[in-house]
């Protein structure tokens, strides 16, 4: 599991700046979900092969009321999810009552904590931090996040207890890994148990923190699968509980580890912003995708038609996804999910030869030529595969950086159709060969210079004669 680092502190101590520094090593996946998680941002980062998740919490002052109190509660939830807490304080402001309140809360919870004395710009670190030592934290670091000072050392310190993550077992050992994601109470728990089989006693108690996703290996019709369940640690008797614990950390982990992601939606509630945020995580990761529209039974035909129209309108940008209308409670349509999972897996993990891809590229170019740039045609010469899950196709040519998005979409649609890729995105990377003469002027020899001068004189004489003829 990736270690989870929570940034905790009162407002305006530099948590967001530190968050941006810690996640800049790769594109941060940031979520601001309405309601439940709009006050927490989640990002991913990497340091020397160690991957981690960062949680940027809302500020805590100890005097919150209303929605601010809810935000403070989310910060404490982040502490529970975290493997290590970075308690950020402002060196220039000194110790405040809010700092002391947070320190007390952290001591009660007993989480591994590093005191981060931020904003030490132009100050003696030891002098600036002297007041904070009374809080009793053994681990402390000095940073100036705005200037990126001390951030790397802080990360090294925070990640020190965690070994490098070993890759998951291969396909032969664990089979197809299916990640089940969705917002609370859309029926993930019911679907998980339906997929595993009614007669199976499912006990998902597993050591670890409450944010651990549960990996459940099982067999069906001789095929091996591993179900990555994010619905929470629970026993079968509690599956009917109305309130279901939800964690973006689990969702990110499940998407990252899965071959195929099943996003569960509630047909009766329709598509909400939180569904689209979760969908965005799956798209960002490039995972094969199956949409399971749950609670489809008992709906009127008009309501069903409205749901279909809403899916077309709000999720049209992910047209490659396989869509199933199911009832996890009664089992309707659940068996067909496996068919799509297999199709998606085969497409996501497919291997194609360079010869096959280059021939396909040549056919696509011959049917629809790339546009001209500065009077020269963009050339696409050959293609080869660069990776799987999602499939990555690397196209080599010249001036590829000028290739318009419309032509890239044409290539994606053509490759998808001919290669029969379903359920997974195809990513393209375009590379141009370097021009050795770019930026260089051709220096003429003395003989070439004289020839050029003669030609220029000749051209001038011709122009002069033509001018005289016109004047007559």
Swiss-Prot record:
The KH-like domain, residue ranges: 350-434
Residues binding GTP 2: 182-189, 229-233, 294-297
Region forming the signal peptide: none
Spans annotated as Disordered: 433-472
Keyword tRNA processing on entry: no
Biased composition (Basic residues): 440-472
UniProt KW keywords: GTP-binding, Nucleotide-binding, Repeat, Ribosome biogenesis
Keyword GTP-binding: yes
GO molecular function: GTP binding; ribosome binding
All residue ranges annotated as the EngA-type G domain in the record: 3-166, 176-349
PROSITE patterns: G_ENGA
Any one biological process term the GO annotation gives: ribosome biogenesis
Family: Belongs to the TRAFAC class TrmE-Era-EngA-EngB-Septin-like GTPase superfamily. EngA (Der) GTPase family.
PANTHER family: GTPASE DER (PTHR43834:SF6)
This protein's name: GTPase Der
């Amino acid at each position: 599991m990736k270690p989870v680092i929570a940034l905790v502190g009162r407002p305006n101590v530099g948590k967001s700046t530190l968050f941006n520094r810690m996640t800049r090593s790769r594109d941060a996946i940031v979520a601001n979900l309405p309601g439940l998680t709009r006050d927490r941002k989640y990002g991913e980062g990497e340091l020397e092969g160690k991957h981690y998740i960062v949680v940027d919490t809302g500020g805590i002052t100890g005097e919150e009321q209303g929605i601010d109190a809810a935000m403070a509660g989310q910060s404490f939830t982040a502490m529970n999810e975290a493997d290590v807490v970075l308690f950020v304080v402002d060196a220039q402001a000194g110790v405040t009552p809010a700092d002391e309140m947070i320190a007390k809360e952290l001591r009660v919870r007993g989480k591994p904590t590093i005191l981060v004395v931020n904003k030490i710009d132009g100050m003696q670190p030891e002098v600036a931090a002297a007041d904070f030592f009374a809080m009793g934290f053994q681990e402390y670091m000095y940073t100036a996040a705005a200037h990126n000072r001390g951030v790397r050392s802080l990360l090294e310190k925070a990640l020190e207890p965690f070994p490098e993550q070993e890759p998951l077992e291969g396909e032969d050992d664990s089979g197809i890994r299916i990640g089940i994601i969705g917002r609370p109470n859309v029926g993930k728990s019911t679907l998980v148990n339906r997929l595993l089989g009614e007669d199976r006693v499912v006990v998902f108690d597993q050591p670890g923190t409450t944010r651990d996703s549960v990996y459940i290996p099982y067999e069906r019709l001789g095929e091996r699968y591993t179900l990555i369940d994010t619905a929470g640690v629970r026993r079968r008797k509690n599956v009917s509980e109305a309130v279901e614990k939800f964690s973006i950390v689990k969702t990110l982990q499940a998407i990252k580890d899965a071959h195929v992601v099943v996003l569960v939606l509630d047909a009766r509630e329709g598509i909400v912003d939180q569904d689209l945020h979760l969908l965005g995580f799956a798209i960002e990761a490039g995972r094969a995708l199956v949409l399971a529209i749950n609670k489809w039974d008992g709906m009127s035909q008009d309501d069903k038609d409205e749901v279909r129209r809403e899916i077309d309108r709000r999720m049209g940008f992910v047209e490659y996804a396989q869509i199933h209308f199911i009832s996890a409670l009664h089992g309707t349509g659940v068996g067909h999910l496996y068919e799509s999972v297999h199709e998606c897996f085969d497409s996501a993990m497919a291997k194609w030869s360079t010869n096959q891809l280059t021939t396909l590229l040549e056919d696509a170019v011959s049917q629809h030529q790339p546009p001209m740039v500065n009077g020269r045609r963009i050339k696409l010469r050959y293609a080869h595969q660069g990776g799987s899950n999602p499939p990555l196709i690397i196209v080599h040519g010249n001036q590829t950086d000028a290739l318009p998005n419309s032509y890239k979409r044409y290539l994606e649609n053509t490759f998808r159709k001919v290669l029969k890729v379903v359920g997974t995105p195809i990513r393209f990377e375009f590379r141009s060969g370097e021009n050795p003469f770019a930026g260089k002027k051709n220096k003429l020899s003395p003989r070439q210079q004289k020839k050029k001068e003669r030609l220029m004189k000749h051209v001038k004489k011709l122009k002069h004669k033509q001018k005289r003829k016109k004047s007559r």
